[in-house]
């Protein structure tokens, strides 16, 4: 095997299946695994200290309790999976360790196919993977001996695969990605080699496995009816065969109107062997799975609304994931975007890995004139006075991005500030997801509002957030990289967005009151500064009395939580300030005025 020449493989690390691709001769090529298949089950089995990955592990998925499936769902969490050693002892494995076994298997057979050592990869993740999940994916790659050059969103990778030959004209593209375990839908804008995600939505607890399970339930109900309530749920071998038969039936019904589910000698009872011969029509299958299909409808509407476009403005529909072969899925998508037929020119099982390989080619310089732009799924904010979530990077901002804003202290002579970072769409920090916090010390003592604290949010191309706080007077700074943002699922993100909309009116009232209180307290401090300043001796007595009265009125309104009165008194102060500006500075010359 020859030395590493900097080749970058593209990996679709899926919940149910994974795929690996590489650029060869300027075109992406999907690599077959040792069993001659172009996709590999994302399944790891531990048996007698042996680690089995892929199809071999899938064949013992039900019978071997040490078989781990859908590990992707645990990425970014502290959850562990337990497996039993040959000596009977138990060991715990992190999601990163299990995922690394899948990546290592993909890497090993890719090296054998290519004939070169491989150390670099682009790995795809669902659009809604958060910082913790993305970091966990990079860690898994590192454990597998891969330097993960870039983490990109699965729908974006798919659009890249479809769009490489179409980058010369602007298009609005809907990507409908129904995989084995997750569902994503995204709207992208593709123009002159630039791919920009306009909006994303989805459900990470919905996938082709759910369609399989409906068939399993159907067969199980038939068996129970025909065999006096026979329940096979604890018969591991029978359940393994049921699962395989259900998946096979689903695939066959994508191409034909009916199929025969044949399971001879499925199990044995006191009355003898149980044989299953059951016809399942496509119509019945679609009836059984209609509630699942309907769960994909709202996310399509959501991304169209979020992107602020009309369905007829969508130029192309891309279908991703093997489950999109189902005719009912295609019909639903077509009904949501009238007049547009989905583009199925690339194998939906392979398209994401192909896009990842193309991105690898971009990073190596082998593919020119393509720029990939992803977005952040939720607003990133810091908590400010009164618990308000002040946004720095708003939802659906294109990444990579860096945003800075100047803040100050909330108390006199404050020597440190806590920087609290949160994620979500609600105006109040407490209603959002806390991502992390850190402290900036060494601030030079000064009246509140005087120190200049610069907060910078930097979100890299992998969607990983770095937060920095810097005192512009002392130049002292501190920072953190957010590696755990609460492990938000797609469902949680969509719920947060819905909650923000549902509570918008109440939240706005709360926020307005806090802002009024903060403004009122700031005015009281400003008036005190004015009265204590050398210029105060130049003020007529009646002006000083007005200021003292304003201070008392504002202070009383704050203490009484009388926000209507507070609003009036703040306006009175602003009018007084305007009058003073005209009276003492009619020609623009500097004179005594409030700050």
Curated annotation (Swiss-Prot):
Family annotation (Gene3D superfamilies): 3.30.420.40, Actin, Chain A, domain 4 (3.90.640.10), Substrate Binding Domain Of DNAk, Chain A, domain 1 (2.60.34.10)
Induction: By stress conditions e.g. heat shock.
CDD domains, A to Z: ASKHA_NBD_HSP70_DnaK-like (cd10234)
A Pfam cross-reference name: HSP70
Keyword Membrane found: no
Domain of life: Bacteria
Keywords: ATP-binding, Chaperone, Nucleotide-binding, Phosphoprotein, Stress response
Modified residues (Phosphothreonine): 182
Any one GO biological process: chaperone cofactor-dependent protein refolding
A molecular function GO annotation: ATP hydrolysis activity
Known function: Acts as a chaperone.
NCBIfam families to which the protein is assigned, alphabetical: PRK00290.1, prok_dnaK
Family: Belongs to the heat shock protein 70 family.
PANTHER family recorded: HEAT SHOCK PROTEIN 70KDA
Protein name (Swiss-Prot/TrEMBL): Chaperone protein DnaK
This protein's encoding gene: dnaK
């Amino acid at each position: 095997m020859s030395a590493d020449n900097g080749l970058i493989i593209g990996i679709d690390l899926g919940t149910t299946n994974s795929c690996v691709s590489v650029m060869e001769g300027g075109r992406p090529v999907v690599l077959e695994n040792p069993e001659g298949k172009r996709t590999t089950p994302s399944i790891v089995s531990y048996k007698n200290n042996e680690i089995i990955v892929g199809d071999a592990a899938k064949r013992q998925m039900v019978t071997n309790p040490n078989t781990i499936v859908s590990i992707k769902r645990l990425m970014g969490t502290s959850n562990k999976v337990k497996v039993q050693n040959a000596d009977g002892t138990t060991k715990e494995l992190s999601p990163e360790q299990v995922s690394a076994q899948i990546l290592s298997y993909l890497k090993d057979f890719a090296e054998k196919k290519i004939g070169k050592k491989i150390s670099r990869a682009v790995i795809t993740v669902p659009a809604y993977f958060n910082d913790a999940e993305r970091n966990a994916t990079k860690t898994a790659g590192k454990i597998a001996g891969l330097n993960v050059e870039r983490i990109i969103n699965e729908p974006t990778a798919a659009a890249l695969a479809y769009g490489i030959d179409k980058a010369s004209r602007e298009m609005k593209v809907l990507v409908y990605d129904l995989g084995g375990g997750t569902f994503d839908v995204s709207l992208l804008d593709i123009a002159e080699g630039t791919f920009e995600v306009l909006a994303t939505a989805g459900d990470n607890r919905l996938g082709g496995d759910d369609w399989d399970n409906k068939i399993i339930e159907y067969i199980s109900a038939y068996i129970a009816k025909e065999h006096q309530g026979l329940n096979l749920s604890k018969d591991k071998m029978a359940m393994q065969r049921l699962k395989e038969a259900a998946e096979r039936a689903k695939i066959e019904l994508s191409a034909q109107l009916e199929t025969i589910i044949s399971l001879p000698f499925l199990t044995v009872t006191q009355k003898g062997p149980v044989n299953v011969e059951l016809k399942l029509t496509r119509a019945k299958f679609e009836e059984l799975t209609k509630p699942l299909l309907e769960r994909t409808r709202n996310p399509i509407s959501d991304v169209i609304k979020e992107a602020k476009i009309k369905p007829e403005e969508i130029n192309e529909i891309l279908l991703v994931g093997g489950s999109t072969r189902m005719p009912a899925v295609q019909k639903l998508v077509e009904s949501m975007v009238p007049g547009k037929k989905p583009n199925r020119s690339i194998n939906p099982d392979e398209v994401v890995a192909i896009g990842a390989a193309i991105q690898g080619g971009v990073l190596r310089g082998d593919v020119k004139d393509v720029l990939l732009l992803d977005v952040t799924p939720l607003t990133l904010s810091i908590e400010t006075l009164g618990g308000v979530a002040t946004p720095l990077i708003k939802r659906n901002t294109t990444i990579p991005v860096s945003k800075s804003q100047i803040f100050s202290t909330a108390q006199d002579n404050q020597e440190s500030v806590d920087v609290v970072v949160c994620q979500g769409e609600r105006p109040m920090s407490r209603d959002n997801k806390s991502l992390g916090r850190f402290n900036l010390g060494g601030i030079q003592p000064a009246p509140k509002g005087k120190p200049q604290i610069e907060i910078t949010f930097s979100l890299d191309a992998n969607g990983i957030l770095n937060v920095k706080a810097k005192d512009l007077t002392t130049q002292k700074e501190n920072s953190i990289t957010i590696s755990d943002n609460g492990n938000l699922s797609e469902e949680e993100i969509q719920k947060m967005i819905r909650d923000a909309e549902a509570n918008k009116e109440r939240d706005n009232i709360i926020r307005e009151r806090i802002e009024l209180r903060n403004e009122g307290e700031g005015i009281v401090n400003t008036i005190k500064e004015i009265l204590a300043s050398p210029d105060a001796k130049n003020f007529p007595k009646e002006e000083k009395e007005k200021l003292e009265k304003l201070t008392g009125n504002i202070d009383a309104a704050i203490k009484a939580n009388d926000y209507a009165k507070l609003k009036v008194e703040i306006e009175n102060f602003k009018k007084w300030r305007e009058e003073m500006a005209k009276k003492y500075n009619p020609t623009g010359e500097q004179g005594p005025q409030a700050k």
